[in-house]
Amino acid sequence: MTDLLTLEPTQTILTGSKKTNFGYLESTDGVINFSIVKNIILNGHHHGNVLYVIRNYASKAVCEKLAKNFDYRVTQSGGNRADDGFVLTNQIGATQFSRNGEQYIHEVNRVNQSVADLMKATSAEDSESLFLNLTLEKEFLERGIHFGPARFKNGYACFATFRRWLDNGVMSLMPHEDMAQVDFAKEDGFEIANTQTVTAYNVCLEAAQGGGQLKIWNLIPDQVCRETLGVTRTGYPYPPHLLNETESLSVQLNAGDLYFMNACHLHGVSSVSEGSRLTAGRFIGKLNDRKVVYWT
């Protein structure tokens, strides 16, 4: 991975697709515009906007309670994710990264109690304000679309994964895209292998006082690009210096903010200079015109 990050800009040209009218949208009135959510999840954008931020939607008191519970449980158990040679993070919850269906569900079953223990700090109403399960179920059902957890045989996806990104060098989270890793699901027919889109949904539980901005580039890498950089099944990492001339946007997120983002676009998190950044989230994918699922 070190060799990849030191590639000279003249050695590699990143190829892929871009959006016209690339940008993002915000809601600040506490009302979620489901048309925007639907278009990002089903089509990857809303008139070119690949990110939708809903400001101050979740209770800051609930976010703070979860953040404190997260810190306590990570201190006690060390979290659920060991150093995998890719990213350094404190984590509670499962990840499908580098796992097929069988491996992912095994991991989900291993860590589910940790997620349940963490969520004990919330009520059913709190959980809905954080993850919008009932809202998304209702809105999609009205359009004849099923929304729910991804399934592999008799197992279901993790409810959500909580992460605090640590120091990963140039950035807290290096530029990457999240479609490539779905390739592992093809090994055993895990249904997310059929996803046509990958949307990242996150709620910011704790915001950094310095740095930690979400950054998105106007580029969806193609398979040739992945192969050139050796990230065909991980989508991680893309060298930041190769993106210097690529259109991008940076957004500061605060505790209580929710966001939906087209995770097929290259994105990352800038270095944190003060404080720390904690999010909880999941991926959402459109399998077909009648089914949308989430996983972690």
Curated annotation (Swiss-Prot):
Required cofactor names: L-ascorbate; Fe(2+)
One GO molecular-function entry: L-ascorbic acid binding
InterPro entries xrefs: Ile_3(1)-dioxygenase-like, WelO5-like
Family: Belongs to the iron/ascorbate-dependent oxidoreductase family.
The enzyme's E.C. designation: 1.14.11.74
Record has Membrane as a keyword: no
Source organism, top-level taxon: Bacteria
Binding note for cofactor: Binds 1 ascorbate molecule per subunit. Binds 1 Fe(2+) ion per subunit.
A matching Pfam family: WelO5
Alphabetically ordered keywords of this record: Dioxygenase, Iron, Metal-binding, Oxidoreductase, Vitamin C
Binding annotation for Fe cation: 176, 178, 267
Catalysed transformations (reactions): L-isoleucine + 2-oxoglutarate + O2 = 3(1)-hydroxy-L-isoleucine + succinate + CO2
Protein name in UniProt: L-isoleucine 3(1)-dioxygenase
Record NCBIfam families: isoleu_diox_hilA (NF041274)
Role description: Catalyzes the hydroxylation of L-isoleucine at the C-4' position to form L-4'-hydroxyisoleucine (4'-HIL). Exhibits low activity with L-valine and L-methionine.
